[in-house]
Amino acid sequence: MNNNIYGIDFGTCNFKVFSKASGKFITEKNTIALINKNQMYAYGDEAYAMYEKAPESINVVFPLSSGVIADYNFLQMMIFEFIEKRMKGKTKNAEFLVAVPTDITDVEKRAFFELFYKSKSRPKNVMLCEKPLADAVGLGIDVNEPTGVMVVDMGADTIEISVISLGGLVLSDLMHFGSNRLDESIISYIRREFNLVIGKKTAMALKEQLGSGLPGRTETMVVVGLDV
Protein backbone atom coordinates (compact mmCIF):
# COMPACT_ATOMS: atom_id res chain seq x y z
CA MET A 1 0.00 0.00 0.00
CA ASN A 2 1.27 3.45 -0.90
CA ASN A 3 1.61 5.66 2.19
CA ASN A 4 3.15 8.55 0.28
CA ILE A 5 -0.16 10.41 0.18
CA TYR A 6 -0.84 14.06 0.94
CA GLY A 7 -4.15 15.69 1.78
CA ILE A 8 -4.24 19.37 0.83
CA ASP A 9 -6.70 22.17 1.51
CA PHE A 10 -6.03 25.37 -0.44
CA GLY A 11 -7.81 28.18 1.36
CA THR A 12 -7.72 31.81 0.33
CA CYS A 13 -6.26 32.70 3.73
CA ASN A 14 -4.78 29.46 5.09
CA PHE A 15 -3.03 26.50 3.51
CA LYS A 16 -3.18 23.03 5.09
CA VAL A 17 -1.22 19.87 4.27
CA PHE A 18 -1.35 16.41 5.88
CA SER A 19 1.18 13.65 5.19
CA LYS A 20 -0.11 10.10 5.65
CA ALA A 21 3.42 8.68 5.72
CA SER A 22 4.70 10.83 8.58
CA GLY A 23 1.45 11.90 10.21
CA LYS A 24 2.63 15.51 10.04
CA PHE A 25 0.11 18.30 9.63
CA ILE A 26 0.94 21.92 8.88
CA THR A 27 -1.20 24.99 8.44
CA GLU A 28 0.18 28.36 7.41
CA LYS A 29 -0.95 31.52 5.70
CA ASN A 30 -1.45 31.09 1.95
CA THR A 31 0.83 34.01 1.20
CA ILE A 32 3.90 34.63 -0.96
CA ALA A 33 6.40 37.51 -0.82
CA LEU A 34 8.04 38.40 -4.14
CA ILE A 35 11.08 40.44 -5.09
CA ASN A 36 11.87 41.61 -8.62
CA LYS A 37 8.19 40.85 -9.44
CA ASN A 38 8.76 37.15 -10.09
CA GLN A 39 11.24 35.79 -7.54
CA MET A 40 9.84 34.11 -4.41
CA TYR A 41 11.42 35.68 -1.34
CA ALA A 42 9.30 34.06 1.40
CA TYR A 43 6.07 32.11 1.78
CA GLY A 44 3.56 31.02 4.39
CA ASP A 45 3.54 32.67 7.81
CA GLU A 46 6.90 34.29 7.10
CA ALA A 47 5.51 36.08 4.05
CA TYR A 48 2.30 37.04 5.86
CA ALA A 49 4.35 38.73 8.60
CA MET A 50 5.55 41.13 5.88
CA TYR A 51 2.03 41.99 4.72
CA GLU A 52 1.32 45.74 5.05
CA LYS A 53 4.86 46.22 6.39
CA ALA A 54 7.09 45.40 3.42
CA PRO A 55 8.99 48.05 1.43
CA GLU A 56 8.08 48.73 -2.21
CA SER A 57 10.74 46.25 -3.35
CA ILE A 58 8.76 43.35 -1.79
CA ASN A 59 5.28 42.49 -3.08
CA VAL A 60 3.12 40.27 -0.85
CA VAL A 61 0.45 38.33 -2.77
CA PHE A 62 -2.27 35.76 -2.09
CA PRO A 63 -2.18 33.06 -4.84
CA LEU A 64 -5.82 31.97 -4.35
CA SER A 65 -9.01 33.97 -4.66
CA SER A 66 -12.49 32.65 -3.83
CA GLY A 67 -11.10 29.12 -3.62
CA VAL A 68 -9.64 29.07 -7.15
CA ILE A 69 -6.11 29.59 -8.41
CA ALA A 70 -5.20 33.21 -9.04
CA ASP A 71 -1.43 32.76 -9.46
CA TYR A 72 -0.63 29.31 -10.85
CA ASN A 73 3.19 29.43 -10.99
CA PHE A 74 3.82 30.72 -7.49
CA LEU A 75 1.21 28.45 -5.91
CA GLN A 76 2.88 25.46 -7.57
CA MET A 77 6.27 26.58 -6.31
CA MET A 78 4.96 27.10 -2.77
CA ILE A 79 3.21 23.75 -2.40
CA PHE A 80 6.35 21.78 -3.17
CA GLU A 81 8.48 24.05 -0.98
CA PHE A 82 6.08 23.31 1.88
CA ILE A 83 6.12 19.55 1.42
CA GLU A 84 9.79 19.04 0.60
CA LYS A 85 11.38 21.58 2.95
CA ARG A 86 8.94 22.18 5.79
CA MET A 87 7.61 18.62 6.02
CA LYS A 88 10.75 16.86 4.72
CA GLY A 89 8.45 14.83 2.49
CA LYS A 90 8.95 13.13 -0.86
CA THR A 91 6.76 14.27 -3.73
CA LYS A 92 7.99 12.01 -6.53
CA ASN A 93 5.38 9.35 -7.36
CA ALA A 94 3.22 10.63 -4.50
CA GLU A 95 -0.57 10.75 -4.44
CA PHE A 96 -2.40 14.00 -3.73
CA LEU A 97 -5.96 14.43 -2.48
CA VAL A 98 -7.04 18.06 -2.90
CA ALA A 99 -10.18 19.61 -1.38
CA VAL A 100 -11.89 22.03 -3.79
CA PRO A 101 -15.13 24.10 -3.76
CA THR A 102 -18.20 22.44 -5.23
CA ASP A 103 -19.06 25.03 -7.88
CA ILE A 104 -15.74 25.50 -9.66
CA THR A 105 -15.72 25.05 -13.43
CA ASP A 106 -14.06 22.24 -15.37
CA VAL A 107 -11.32 24.67 -16.39
CA GLU A 108 -10.67 25.56 -12.74
CA LYS A 109 -10.62 21.86 -11.81
CA ARG A 110 -8.11 21.20 -14.59
CA ALA A 111 -5.88 23.91 -13.14
CA PHE A 112 -5.71 22.01 -9.84
CA PHE A 113 -4.81 18.78 -11.66
CA GLU A 114 -2.14 20.53 -13.72
CA LEU A 115 -0.70 22.15 -10.61
CA PHE A 116 0.64 18.69 -9.75
CA TYR A 117 0.79 16.77 -13.03
CA LYS A 118 2.82 19.53 -14.71
CA SER A 119 5.27 19.76 -11.82
CA LYS A 120 8.68 18.14 -11.47
CA SER A 121 7.30 15.64 -8.91
CA ARG A 122 5.56 13.41 -11.48
CA PRO A 123 2.79 12.31 -9.08
CA LYS A 124 1.32 8.84 -9.18
CA ASN A 125 -2.21 10.15 -8.82
CA VAL A 126 -4.12 13.38 -8.17
CA MET A 127 -7.69 13.31 -6.84
CA LEU A 128 -10.09 16.15 -6.18
CA CYS A 129 -12.57 15.97 -3.31
CA GLU A 130 -15.46 18.36 -2.74
CA LYS A 131 -14.69 20.46 0.33
CA PRO A 132 -17.96 19.79 2.21
CA LEU A 133 -17.30 16.03 2.12
CA ALA A 134 -13.70 16.55 3.25
CA ASP A 135 -14.92 18.81 6.07
CA ALA A 136 -17.46 16.25 7.24
CA VAL A 137 -14.96 13.37 7.22
CA GLY A 138 -12.46 15.55 9.06
CA LEU A 139 -15.08 16.22 11.73
CA GLY A 140 -15.51 12.48 12.24
CA ILE A 141 -18.95 12.32 10.62
CA ASP A 142 -19.96 9.09 8.89
CA VAL A 143 -21.00 10.58 5.55
CA ASN A 144 -22.42 7.24 4.36
CA GLU A 145 -25.24 7.23 6.92
CA PRO A 146 -28.78 7.93 5.61
CA THR A 147 -28.97 11.02 7.80
CA GLY A 148 -28.82 14.57 6.54
CA VAL A 149 -25.92 16.56 8.00
CA MET A 150 -25.47 20.28 7.39
CA VAL A 151 -21.88 21.51 7.03
CA VAL A 152 -21.08 25.23 7.01
CA ASP A 153 -17.60 26.23 5.84
CA MET A 154 -16.85 29.90 6.51
CA GLY A 155 -13.73 31.04 4.67
CA ALA A 156 -11.98 34.29 3.83
CA ASP A 157 -13.67 34.80 0.44
CA THR A 158 -16.53 32.29 0.44
CA ILE A 159 -19.12 30.65 2.68
CA GLU A 160 -20.32 27.21 1.61
CA ILE A 161 -23.43 25.62 3.12
CA SER A 162 -24.02 21.96 2.26
CA VAL A 163 -26.23 19.04 3.24
CA ILE A 164 -24.61 15.60 3.07
CA SER A 165 -26.26 12.17 3.14
CA LEU A 166 -25.43 8.66 1.87
CA GLY A 167 -21.91 9.61 0.81
CA GLY A 168 -22.84 12.54 -1.40
CA LEU A 169 -24.04 16.12 -1.52
CA VAL A 170 -27.81 16.55 -1.36
CA LEU A 171 -27.43 20.26 -1.96
CA SER A 172 -24.75 22.91 -1.66
CA ASP A 173 -24.71 26.68 -2.00
CA LEU A 174 -21.53 28.74 -2.29
CA MET A 175 -21.75 32.43 -1.44
CA HIS A 176 -18.95 34.63 -2.69
CA PHE A 177 -18.27 36.58 0.45
CA GLY A 178 -16.54 35.70 3.71
CA SER A 179 -14.45 37.07 6.53
CA ASN A 180 -12.52 39.38 4.19
CA ARG A 181 -15.79 41.27 3.63
CA LEU A 182 -16.07 41.78 7.40
CA ASP A 183 -12.52 43.14 7.50
CA GLU A 184 -13.34 45.61 4.72
CA SER A 185 -16.48 46.73 6.57
CA ILE A 186 -14.51 47.30 9.78
CA ILE A 187 -11.90 49.35 7.89
CA SER A 188 -14.65 51.47 6.31
CA TYR A 189 -16.44 51.98 9.62
CA ILE A 190 -13.29 53.08 11.49
CA ARG A 191 -12.46 55.53 8.73
CA ARG A 192 -15.99 56.92 8.55
CA GLU A 193 -16.55 57.26 12.29
CA PHE A 194 -13.07 58.19 13.52
CA ASN A 195 -11.25 59.50 10.42
CA LEU A 196 -8.64 56.82 11.04
CA VAL A 197 -7.16 54.53 8.40
CA ILE A 198 -6.27 51.06 9.69
CA GLY A 199 -4.79 48.06 7.88
CA LYS A 200 -6.36 44.69 7.24
CA LYS A 201 -4.37 43.02 10.02
CA THR A 202 -5.72 45.53 12.54
CA ALA A 203 -9.26 44.95 11.26
CA MET A 204 -8.78 41.19 11.64
CA ALA A 205 -7.57 41.67 15.23
CA LEU A 206 -10.66 43.76 16.03
CA LYS A 207 -12.92 41.13 14.48
CA GLU A 208 -11.30 38.20 16.26
CA GLN A 209 -10.99 39.83 19.70
CA LEU A 210 -14.20 41.85 19.86
CA GLY A 211 -16.49 40.30 17.26
CA SER A 212 -19.61 38.48 18.42
CA GLY A 213 -22.80 37.17 16.91
CA LEU A 214 -24.68 38.24 20.04
CA PRO A 215 -25.32 41.76 21.35
CA GLY A 216 -24.19 43.03 24.74
CA ARG A 217 -20.40 42.75 24.63
CA THR A 218 -18.67 45.74 26.22
CA GLU A 219 -14.95 45.02 25.72
CA THR A 220 -12.77 47.67 24.11
CA MET A 221 -9.50 47.63 22.22
CA VAL A 222 -6.93 50.30 21.38
CA VAL A 223 -5.88 50.43 17.72
CA VAL A 224 -3.29 52.50 15.89
CA GLY A 225 -3.80 53.95 12.42
CA LEU A 226 -3.27 56.94 10.16
CA ASP A 227 -5.21 60.09 11.06
CA VAL A 228 -6.93 61.53 7.98
Region annotations inferred by a language model:
Residues M1-M154, I164-V228:
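Nucleotide/phosphate-binding catalytic cleft detector across ATP-hydrolyzing
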